[in-house]
Amino acid sequence: MYYKIDLSNYEPREVPAYQEFTNYNDISSEQIQVISEELAEFKDSFGKDWQEWNLKDLRSRLKDNWTFYLTECGWCFIDWNRKYPYLCNRYIIPEYRNKGLGSDLVWLRCNEIKQQGYNYASIKLEDWNKPALSVMKENIFTKMD
C-alpha cells in the first residue's frame, strides 16, 4: 500500500549518524565491499533470499537523481523523480532489526525531504511487514489511491 506523508508540520528528528551519497564514486571501496557482502546475504523479513537491487542498480539510481543513505546498520534511498519524493528500499542488517532503526531510516529521509523544501513524500508499506508499519503510529500517513 502506498502512503502520502504530510510533512507540513513535521519537526526534524534526531537520527543515527549516516552518510549521504548522490554520486557512486563518492562511496569508498570498503563501503562497497560491505554493501556487496550484505547484498549477497540479502534476506527478506521471512528469511528468504531476495534481490531488490545490486551495485549496478545503485550506480544507475545515483545517476538518475536518487539519494543513497548509508548507516552502520543499514541503508535506504530517496527517489526524487516522482510527484512526491519516494522513500524506498529501506534495509536493516539482520542483527540490528527490531530496535527501532527502521523508523530512524524513515525519519532521516523525512528530515532531508523537509530540509529540501518539500511538504509531502510517499512510501510503500506492506501490510505483512509489521516492523515497517511501526511508523504508522505517527499521524502523518494517509493511503494513496
Annotate each predicted stretch with a short phrase:
Residues 90-98, 125-126:
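A short, internal acetyl-CoA/4′-phosphopantetheine-binding micro-motif in the GNAT/acyltransferase core
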Residues 47-92:
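A conserved beta-strand-loop-helix scaffold within acyl/acetyltransferase catalytic domains
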Residues 113-125:
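Conserved GNAT acetyl-CoA-binding A-motif
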Residues 96, 100-108:
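Conserved acetyl-CoA pyrophosphate-binding loop and the N-cap/start of the following alpha-helix
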Residues 34-50:
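Helix-loop element at the rim of GNAT/NAT acetyltransferase active sites that forms part
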Residues 103, 127-145:
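Conserved active-site alpha-helix within GNAT-family acetyltransferase domains
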Residues 1-25, 145:
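Acyl-donor-binding surface of acyltransferase catalytic domains
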